[in-house]
Amino acid sequence: MASLKEIDGRIKSTKKMKQITKAMNMVSSSKLRRAEKNTKQFEPYMEKMQDAITAIAGASKNSSHPMLRPRQVQRSGYLVITSDKGLAGAYSSNVLKRLINDIKEKHTSSDEYSIIVLGQSGVDFLKNRGYEIENSLVDVPDQPSFKSIQAIAKHAIDLFSEEHIDELKIYYSHYVSVLENKPTTKQVLPLSREDSSQGQGQMSSYEFEPDKESILSVILPQYVESLIYGTILDAKASEHAARMTAMKNASDNATELIDDLSLQYNRARQAEITQQITEIVGGSAALE
């Protein structure tokens, strides 16, 4: 049985750890609120951009723009969003497992795909397993600006435009609620034209200057960059929620451990006192 000193030391160290996890929970909660706000503020812009894209594409069904034209997939591009820091439960590992499973299922050679990674945990995970990384971005801010991710988003788009890849998919954790995040795969390029007919009626009376193709050549890359940025905002909200939940669970577990250790301490203390009383009584009896 552990001594009173050992048990007391464990209680003190666990209390200190609980203070840390509780503080981290509060910090993550604050970051989550900001991330939710950023995502909500970005949604109206994306909706308007989506309206413009579907309207122009709907009015130009025969568009030859490469971003709207599916082609035979010989090489896939994967943009993977993970965290830079740990202590977020299975946030990154679930996304990476999904990616690895898809690679093993769909590809027989590393020449058939390119991987772009956001987040140090993803870089470390893939490098340790021998996967080649096309490009990476680490130290992504907790509240990323568009400028902070634009370069890597443009690189992913350029790979598609220059036909180094034939499709681009994003692997990330979608924020559902504080208690739920969902590993998700999103097709980014080529863009879907399923909804393009929705804008055709509302834009049929408009004239496009200089012409629809010229407008698409400018607006489509901007739209895809924005789509990637919006996905990163979503993933960041999911990360903060996952870390907040993990720290709350750690704090709750610390509370339970402190209670158990306190019970052990009291029992050990009681046994020690009983032993001391027994020794005193025994000594008194021997003196009589």
Curated annotation (Swiss-Prot):
Cited SUPFAM superfamilies: ATP synthase (F1-ATPase), gamma subunit
Keywords, ordered alphabetically: ATP synthesis, Cell membrane, CF(1), Hydrogen ion transport, Ion transport, Membrane, Transport
GO biological process, one term: proton motive force-driven plasma membrane ATP synthesis
GO terms of molecular function: ATP binding; proton-transporting ATP synthase activity, rotational mechanism
UniProt GO cellular component terms: plasma membrane; proton-transporting ATP synthase complex
Pfam families (UniProt xref): ATP-synt
Localization terms from the record: Cell membrane
Membrane topology: Peripheral membrane protein
Protein origin, superkingdom: Bacteria
Alphabetized InterPro entries for the sequence: ATP_synth_F1_ATPase_gsu, ATP_synth_F1_gsu
Known partners and oligomeric status: F-type ATPases have 2 components, CF(1) - the catalytic core - and CF(0) - the membrane proton channel. CF(1) has five subunits: alpha(3), beta(3), gamma(1), delta(1), epsilon(1). CF(0) has three main subunits: a, b and c.
Functional description taken from the UniProt entry: Produces ATP from ADP in the presence of a proton gradient across the membrane. The gamma chain is believed to be important in regulating ATPase activity and the flow of protons through the CF(0) complex.
Membership in a protein family: Belongs to the ATPase gamma chain family.
HAMAP family: ATP_synth_gamma_bact
Name of the molecule in the record: ATP synthase gamma chain
Organism: Staphylococcus haemolyticus (strain JCSC1435)
